[in-house]
């Protein structure tokens, strides 16, 4: 669904166009941007530029800061690991946001994900599942990142270990992720794509001018 914002001259503009103009700094558009952030959470969409614009407006207008919207923005950034979206969002947080206990917990979760300590991540999430369920597709987005890490780290992995990394999923969910990543079950192990197949040779060409080579040739005479 396309969101529109109303300009001072009465004209309407798609929110994506507004974000490319100076109007992105107009606090009168904040409510529309916040509604767009909430829609992302409901419909499993993601628009980093809109979310950054929202945080920037909070910076310029601290009295308008909304913690609930802040939570959504940070959680959506988590779903886009391993990209650096979360770092960008964190850099725009106000002291009032940084001192909030829930924001601190989300930042801690980001740190855990960055360290790839997935079992600890899921144990923290399990303490308050409804909070994360507000973000449609949150769990699957994290599992996609888990599979990304597994795919570049292992040639084979014990099935039960993978189950734990994915958040203690059942057999059906496990098989779905194995199939999605073109892995294969082999008894108690999961065979991941052969690493040699992912290694690409790199050709390096260095140009050496004759002027640079002449002194060396002279020394060899």
Swiss-Prot record:
<keyword id="KW-0396">Initiation factor</keyword>
<dbReference type="InterPro" id="IPR016024">
    <property type="entry name" value="ARM-type_fold"/>
</dbReference>
<protein>
    <recommendedName>
        <fullName>Eukaryotic translation initiation factor 3 subunit K</fullName>
    </recommendedName>
</protein>
<dbReference type="GO" id="GO:0006446">
    <property type="term" value="P:regulation of translational initiation"/>
</dbReference>
<dbReference type="InterPro" id="IPR000717">
    <property type="entry name" value="PCI_dom"/>
</dbReference>
<dbReference type="GO" id="GO:0016282">
    <property type="term" value="C:eukaryotic 43S preinitiation complex"/>
</dbReference>
<dbReference type="GO" id="GO:0043022">
    <property type="term" value="F:ribosome binding"/>
</dbReference>
<dbReference type="GO" id="GO:0003723">
    <property type="term" value="F:RNA binding"/>
</dbReference>
<keyword id="KW-0963">Cytoplasm</keyword>
<dbReference type="InterPro" id="IPR036390">
    <property type="entry name" value="WH_DNA-bd_sf"/>
</dbReference>
<dbReference type="InterPro" id="IPR033464">
    <property type="entry name" value="CSN8_PSD8_EIF3K"/>
</dbReference>
<feature type="domain" description="PCI">
    <location>
        <begin position="46"/>
        <end position="207"/>
    </location>
</feature>
<dbReference type="GO" id="GO:0033290">
    <property type="term" value="C:eukaryotic 48S preinitiation complex"/>
</dbReference>
<dbReference type="Pfam" id="PF10075">
    <property type="entry name" value="CSN8_PSD8_EIF3K"/>
</dbReference>
<dbReference type="InterPro" id="IPR036388">
    <property type="entry name" value="WH-like_DNA-bd_sf"/>
</dbReference>
<dbReference type="GO" id="GO:0001732">
    <property type="term" value="P:formation of cytoplasmic translation initiation complex"/>
</dbReference>
<dbReference type="GO" id="GO:0005852">
    <property type="term" value="C:eukaryotic translation initiation factor 3 complex"/>
</dbReference>
<dbReference type="InterPro" id="IPR016020">
    <property type="entry name" value="Transl_init_fac_sub12_N_euk"/>
</dbReference>
<keyword id="KW-0648">Protein biosynthesis</keyword>
<comment type="function">
    <text>Component of the eukaryotic translation initiation factor 3 (eIF-3) complex, which is involved in protein synthesis of a specialized repertoire of mRNAs and, together with other initiation factors, stimulates binding of mRNA and methionyl-tRNAi to the 40S ribosome. The eIF-3 complex specifically targets and initiates translation of a subset of mRNAs involved in cell proliferation.</text>
</comment>
<dbReference type="GO" id="GO:0003743">
    <property type="term" value="F:translation initiation factor activity"/>
</dbReference>
<dbReference type="InterPro" id="IPR009374">
    <property type="entry name" value="eIF3k"/>
</dbReference>
<comment type="subunit">
    <text>Component of the eukaryotic translation initiation factor 3 (eIF-3) complex.</text>
</comment>
<comment type="similarity">
    <text>Belongs to the eIF-3 subunit K family.</text>
</comment>
